[in-house]
Swiss-Prot record:
Mg(2+) 2 binds at D419, V420, D463. Residues 1200-1215 are annotated as: Required for both calcium stimulation and maintenance of autoinhibition. InterPro entries: A/G_cyclase (IPR001054), A/G_cyclase_CS (IPR018297), AC_N (IPR032628), Adcy (IPR030672), Adcy_conserved_dom (IPR009398), Nucleotide_cyclase (IPR029787). Mg(2+) 1 binds at D419, D463. GO terms for cellular component: apical plasma membrane; axon; basolateral plasma membrane; caveola; clathrin-coated pit; clathrin-coated vesicle membrane; dendrite; excitatory synapse. One of its GO terms (molecular function) is metal ion binding. Residues 1109-1251 are annotated as: Involved in CALM1 interaction. This is Adenylate cyclase type 8. It comes from Homo sapiens (Human).
Length: 1251
């Protein structure tokens, strides 16, 4: 059995993955893909690396990789929000070369090499919500993360952050705690002095020297003044003054030591006070570690020099001086460990706070990106209506069953259709990049004109552009707006023609009436309009004249005679207009007006010779169109148009900001705000009990108690070092019984060595397996760790006190009858009973060494120690102290050694307990921040899943990666040419006859409901494995457009036409699907499908509403194969037939047909009807449905719920005095500042559930 079976993984083979557990009760989510499109793009989207809410380490050094555990038990099957699981989170970060371990197989650690981009098991990907390549470890923040060996961390002098701003914020973050510690230390010292004064006046054998009283009052006054200054300046954010006040406090205490050495102290020779000063310097004064070390060494050296130069004892020996030096060295060593590891813990807590703040900021950024993506699909008024309906939906899992369509009916609108004449020829002469650039600039210009003329762009269909006026805000002049829009479009296209020398023009049709608008289907959502009037506007365009605006009688009636018109004769050019007897007219516009440039066009700065290039643009110098998705995934994450007129969906009032900066500056600002909130200890009052510091939530307390203590080994090694110092101190003093003392300390050292061995065994493969298993269990078990800690403290305590048992003092003699010969020279250790107390103090400091030991347990242990010492010094061995006092302080105004010793221990008890309380509070606050950060990160993960759904429904995956993964500072528009692509159009000819706008079918809404079901079924077919190479492009009314072979992998695949076969299979599957729908809807719809293949140009155009589309002869031919086809049949041209017939498909020859736009140059086209497959494709697996798609309503619902949670947290964090959490986003929160509705109430809104 390998060691990896015993303890957690270490080394480069580790993989840090978090597999999100599907929500309970949601069967569909179990199969949802875990891989997100944002996986490799997070760093580029947010301009900084993703700082996760978990531990990361550095993989350097021979000691192993620096690693740490998952914050709240994030094992492989852990679901963070419930804080379930058995793994635990570490309290401290690990520096370079450090090593951390976990339970046997229960934890997974981060790997710095970053393999998160690999695909996970099950084919779904393993991203979870972290990507380690962009996740800096804690060591990335530190100048020096410390040195570790075999899991034991040793202090270093420099323990600061690399960033000055981060260091400044850290100092401010713990400013309040350090201020409080300094005040408590000074108050404790003042109380000690007052207690000494009272005891001295009541118990001293001689009156107090007046100079002692003056010095006592002076130093007490200094400390009171320091406390007052620190308290008065509590609002100061600078930590420098606090450090200087700490230096002043240290100087005052050291001066008192000097006074004691000169004979003017109340604590005898002052050794005990030196120990307290050293402990306070390292653990309670706000001094950097380097300053504390210098101060500690200075204090120790001063005391040793005073003992040598001005001896205060009757008998002084070199051994005694060395013992004092060793005593001070021990306290300095323990203090350095305590100070370094405490500061490390506080820095870790600060980093966790920073991670929490950054997670919240990223969540807000994800909210904004979600909103932008939604608004790129839907107009604002539709989003408002959906949010208003969803605002009270609280069921977390309802979004997975939420299938509502939102159809709005608007009366009195005008619809404009515009088509670029000559575009087909243009697409054959321009390169892909040039074509997409021209279209983007042209349609960006149209979008700008639409805004100026109060029109809403609906959709771009290849080279067709259509918009509506009077939607959503009703306008009396909607027809005028559309006519002016059309005139501006004609001016613009003629300007383009003059600049590019290409024969292009606009054919425009306008009709007035009513529309239904909304979004249908589950994939490639696009806002669209439907109605009989929309069809008429479309036919007016197709039956129009290039360069003229073709309008209907309904539109003419709305114009009120403001424009000159002439007969349009549309019936002569369009069968639909003739069949329905629609009168048409042409707007008469002076030719010179049409030839003039649009008013907003200024002279370009480019020369005409440059413009004659085939790649030339026509954009003027003062304006250039935005790139698609710049306002969504661009580096300047500016707020979307949400902030204008409007919706304050963003948490923490981010909508008031000009930019959302996710860089360090914004995070630091947020941390400053968090510091202000934290200063009120609100979090502590809400979650932590006052004295015990236990969590009020028992499950949270259990989770905290199960945390792995990453510095437990370091604490135990430090305790062992303290034992060695205790042994050295007592060995330096002479003993009459050397052998018993040798045996005693040998046993204690062996026992403590065994404790160290058993807790570090997992790092030594040479040790027995059972020992390594035991080691792993101890390190992961709260109770076992506490047993080891208590055993270590007990051993040190026994080492400090057992030597008193070997004293030769006759205990049978009553103390009151004792007489002492002051001239006698004692060379036995019992002659120095104060060292039993001093080493006992070191044993008490051992409690402070164990940073994670519960402060209440520390208090209990310390009280037991003091009780035992009180029992020994006041009763059994009181004579030792009396004899010592008579020998060294006879006749002086000196308080008894045993009284001073108990007071010294009481000082240490209070100091160690308070220090333990501060550390535990920091650790528990750290834990709370981590839990909160992890919850918010999981919320961000959910939002990213929604965003991935949104993005996947706007762009194909490989195109989305293009926009997310690359540095697009100077990047051109996305465009790509393909040589071997399959294109399919599938329409439902009978749906036009089925569609009617009557009261019975809710003015056409019920007809659209059925169309939504049909499109949704088609979309779900794309979720099958066999159709993974097919991309839906769009729906055009009741026509479904799909393409195969767009992914780069398929272009280089050996099976060049495998995707075309899949497209043919897909068309056959569509016919089967429509038959199933007919059975349930009692209809007889038939599909008319056209398929073609060849070269196309693909690209993304439009900045505010980006659209992915394809252009070229192949697209036109596929569309004509549909429009010239036969209901219930699949028509393909001869070239496509020649490929598919060899792939197992059967065909029926139709004959030669005339195809508009192609037959003019190439003659009639031979076409065939696809009948089906003759033989199955051996490479096609049985149909397996991939995870289902969510409706747009479901995605918006997820966004609303996330925003509600953020709003509730915000109000809680801000401690709203109203006591009422209004956490829901309703229609009022989404109104403009003036309080008016942003649009007219939609009529006929349908919100009933789909079957």
């Amino acid at each position: 059995m390998e060691l990896s079976d015993v303890r957690c993984l270490t080394g480069s083979e580790e993989l840090y993955t978090i597999h999100p557990t599907p929500p309970a009760g949601d069967g569909r989510s179990a199969s949802r893909p875990q891989r997100l499109l944002w996986q490799t793009a997070v760093r580029h989207i947010t301009e900084q690396r993703f700082i996760h809410g978990h531990r990361g380490g550095s993989g350097s050094g021979s000691g192993g990789s620096g690693k740490a555990s998952d914050p709240a038990g994030g094992g492989p099957n852990h679901h963070a929000p419930q804080l379930s699981g058995d793994s635990a989170l570490p309290l401290y970060s690990l520096g370079p070369g450090e090593r951390a371990h976990s339970t046997c197989g229960t934890k997974v650690f981060p790997e710095r090499s970053g393999s998160g981009s690999a695909s996970g098991s099950g084919g779904g990907g393993d991203l979870g919500f972290l990507h380690l390549d962009c996740a800096p470890s804690n060591s990335d923040f530190f100048l020096n993360g410390g040195y570790s060996y075999r899991g034991v961390i040793f202090p270093t002098l420099r323990n600061s952050f690399k960033s000055r701003d981060l260091e400044r914020l850290y100092q401010r973050y713990f400013l309040g705690q350090r201020r409080k510690s300094e005040v408590v230390m000074n108050v404790l010292d003042v109380l000690t002095k007052l207690t000494l004064l009272v005891l001295h006046l009541s118990l001293a054998s001689a009156p107090m020297d007046p100079l002692k009283g003056i010095l006592l009052g002076f130093f007490t006054g200094i400390e009171v003044v320091i406390c007052a200054l620190v308290v008065v300046r509590k609002d100061t954010t600078s930590h420098t003054y606090l450090q200087y006040s700490g230096v002043v406090t240290w100087v005052a205490m050291t001066t008192q030591i000097l006074a004691a050495g000169l004979g003017y102290g109340l604590l005898g020779d002052g050794i005990g006070y030196v120990l307290f000063t050293l402990f306070a310097t390292y653990s309670m004064l706000p001094l950097p570690l380097t300053w504390a070390i210098l101060a500690g060494l200075g204090t120790s050296l001063l005391q040793v020099i005073l003992q040598v130069v001005i001896p205060r004892l009757a008998v002084i020996s070199i051994n005694q001086v060395v013992a004092q030096a060793v005593l001070f060295m021990c306290m300095n060593t323990a203090g350095i460990f305590i100070s370094y590891l405490s500061d490390r813990a506080q820095r870790q807590a600060f980093l966790e706070t920073r991670r929490c703040v950054e997670a919240r900021l990223r969540l807000e950024t994800e909210n904004q990106r979600q909103e932008r993506l939604v608004l790129s699909v839907l107009p604002r008024f539709v989003v408002l209506e959906m949010i208003n309906d969803m605002t009270n939906v609280e069921d977390e899992h309802l979004q997975h069953q939420f299938h509502r369509i939102y159809i709005h009916r608007y009366e009195n609108v005008s619809i404009l259709f515009a088509d670029v004449k000559g575009f087909t020829n243009l697409s054959t002469t321009l390169s892909a990049q040039e074509l997409v650039r021209m279209l983007n600039e042209l349609f960006a210009r149209f979008d700008r004109l639409a805004h100026e003329h109060h029109c809403l762009r609906i959709k771009i269909l290849g080279d067709c552009y259509y918009c509506v006026s009077g939607l959503p805000e009703p306008r009396q002049d909607h027809a005028h707006c559309c006519v002016e829009m059309g005139l501006s479009m004609i001016k613009t296209i003629r300007y383009v023609r003059s600049r590019t020398k290409h024969d292009v023009d606009m054919r425009i049709g306008i009709h007035s009436g009513s529309v239904l608008c909304g979004v249908l289907g589950l994939r490639k959502w696009q806002f669209d309009v439907w109605s009989w009037d929309v069809d008429i506007a479309n036919k007016l365009e197709s039956g129009g004249i290039p360069g003229r605006i073709h309008i209907s009688k309904a539109t003419l009636d709305c114009l009120n005679g403001d424009y000159n018109v002439e007969e349009g004769h549309g019936k002569e050019r369009n069968e639909f207009l003739r069949k329905h007897n629609i009168e048409t007219y042409l707007i008469k516009q002076p030719e010179d007006s049409l030839l003039s440039l649009p008013e907003d066009i200024v002279k370009e700065s480019v020369s005409s010779s440059d413009r004659r290039n085939s790649g030339a643009t026509f954009t003027e110098g003062s304006w250039s169109p935005e790139l698609p998705f710049d306002n969504i995934v661009g580096k300047q994450n500016t707020l979307a148009a949400l902030t204008r007129n409007s919706i304050n969906l963003l948490p923490n009032h981010l909508a008031q900001a000009l930019h959302v900066q996710s860089g360090p500056e914004e995070i630091n600002k947020r941390i400053e705000h968090t510091i202000d909130l934290r200063s009120g200890d609100k979090l502590r009052r809400e979650h932590i009990k006052p004295f015990s510091l236990m969590f009020k939530d028992s499950s949270l307390e259990h989770k905290y108690s199960q945390m792995r203590d990453e510095v437990f080994k370091s604490n135990l090694v430090c305790a062992f070092i303290v034992l060695l110092f205790i042994t050295a101190i007592q060995s330096l003093l002479p003993s009459s019984r050397v052998m018993p003392m040798t045996i005693q300390f040998s046993i204690l050292i062996m026992l403590h060595s065994a404790l160290v061995l058993i807790t570090t065994a997992e790092d030594y493969k040479c040790l027995p397996l059972i020992l390594r298993k035991t080691c792993c269990w101890i390190n992961e078990t709260y109770l076992a760790r506490n047993v080891i800690i208590f055993a270590s403290i007990l051993i040190n305590f026994l080492g400090a006190i057992l030597n008193i048992l070997w004293c030769d003092f006759d205990k049978s003699i009553p103390l009151k009858n004792l007489t002492f010969n002051s001239s006698a020279v004692f060379t036995d250790i019992c002659s120095y009973p104060e060292y039993f107390v001093f080493t006992g103090v070191l044993a008490m400091v051992t409690c402070a060494v164990f940073l994670r030991l519960n402060s209440v347990l520390k208090l209990a242990v310390l009280l037991i120690m003091i009780a035992i010492y009180a029992l020994l010094t006041e009763t059994v061995y009181a004579g030792l102290f009396l004899r010592y006092d008579n020998l060294n302080h006879s006749g002086e105004d000196f308080l008894g050694t045993k009284e001073v010793s108990l007071l010294l221990m009481a000082m240490f008890l209070l100091a160690v307990f308070y220090h333990g309380q501060q550390l535990e509070y920091t650790a528990r606050l750290d834990f709370l921040w981590r839990v909160q950060a992890k919850e918010e990160i999981n919320e961000m993960k959910e939002l990213r899943e929604h965003n991935e759904n949104m993005l996947r429904n706007i762009l194909p995956s490989h195109v989305a990666r293009h926009f997310l993964e690359k540095d697009r500072d100077n990047e051109e528009l996305y465009s790509q040419s393909y040589d071997a692509v399959g294109v399919m159009f599938a329409s439902i000819p009978g749906f036009a006859d089925f569609y009617s706008q009557t009261e019975m079918n809710n003015q056409g809404v019920e007809c659209l409901r059925l169309l939504n079901e049909i499109i949704a079924d088609f979309d779900e077919l794309l979720g099958e494995d066999r159709f993974q190479d097919i991309e839906k492009i769009k729906t055009i009314g009741s026509t479904y457009m799909a393409v195969s072979g767009l992914s780069p992998e398929k272009q280089q695949c050996e099976d060049k036409w495998g995707h075309l076969c899949a497209l043919a299979d897909f068309s056959l599957a569509l016919t089967e699907s429509i038959q199933e729908i007919n059975k349930h809807s009692f209809n007889n719809f038939e599909l008319r499908i056209g398929i073609s293949h060849g070269s196309v140009v693909a690209g993304v155009i439009g900045a505010k509403k980006p659209q992915y589309d394809i252009w070229g002869k192949t697209v036109n031919l596929a569309s004509r194969m549909d429009s010239t086809g036969v209901s219930g049949r699949i028509q393909v041209p001869e070239e496509t037939y020649l490929i598919l017939k060899d792939q197992g498909f059967a065909f029926d020859y139709r004959g030669e047909i005339y195809v508009k736009g192609i037959s003019e140059q190439e003659g009639k086209i031979k076409t065939y009807f696809l009948l089906g497959r003759v033989q199955p494709n051996p490479f096609i697996l049985p149909p397996r449905r991939l995870p289902g798609q969510y409706s747009l309503a479901a995605v918006v619902l997820g966004l609303v719920q996330s925003l509600n949670r953020q709003r509730q947290k915000q109000l809680l964090n801000e401690n709203n005095n109203t006591g009422i959490i209004k956490g829901h986003y309703n229609r009022r929160t989404l109104l403009s500042p003036s309080g008016t509705e942003p649009g007219a109430q939609a009529e006929g809104t349908d919100k009933s559930d789909l079957p």
